[in-house]
């Protein structure tokens, strides 16, 4: 093998190995490989180099340079679907969803079997509040890759949000077939079961979810709200208190426990939790002013002292 070609390939392959753990070193090796490539006129696919460098630049947070590298690849080959996909990912990360969707669509026009592009385009539609389009493309991603757990999981969540509970149940069952132990799928199954009017099944799924991940705060919230609906306020407090133990930074858990304490006439404890929640979250503090559930607290001395001071 030509010595220069060997050197180029060594640098190029080593850069690829190091890209995730040592992206800056990897980028330096790619640049050295390009230097050899350009000086010696080696026969190698330059687009592959540009795409790899763009990925490196993106990992390093050098978004503008990554965009230029992807665009250079497109100049060389306007039909390079991966370059459009890479651009879409960058705009997606910047929450420029409309622009990201435009590039995802271009990628799948060029490669109709690009399952990752369908999935992330669905996610961009989802984040942008376009639930119908999100469902359409999650379905396509799942069709192209029937082992794509997140396509089924996210599809179930979208169907649940749009009130299509039977479709949501079918999707989450497929997700659980792929990953029966995944806490998020078990959580979503709990949400869907409760929506369908099966609170006991929902409780079962939520408990399984907590066994897999005791630090997912929304599971405690949803489980406690089922007990609230059943007027088992003590059990609701017990569940949400456990959530606070595992996720003490979740302000909404304190807020909801305050509401549960109100139902138990434990007003002093309710005010203390409300103070913690409002200190942690300006949004919750603003919300509480119009929350009628908290009206029994408003004449209490501790409530007046703290929240009058907050207002003034």
Language model segments and positions:
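Helix-start (N-cap) detector for alpha-helical repeat units in TPR-like alpha-solenoids
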Residues: 8, 47-48, 81-82, 115-116, ...
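Canonical tetratricopeptide repeat
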Residues: 13, 52, 86, 120, ...
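Register position in tetratricopeptide repeats
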Residues: 20, 59, 93-94, 127-128, ...
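Canonical positions in the second alpha-helix
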Residues: 33, 73, 106-107, 140-141, ...
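Structural marker of alpha-solenoid helical repeat scaffolds
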Residues: 36, 40-42, 76, 110, ...
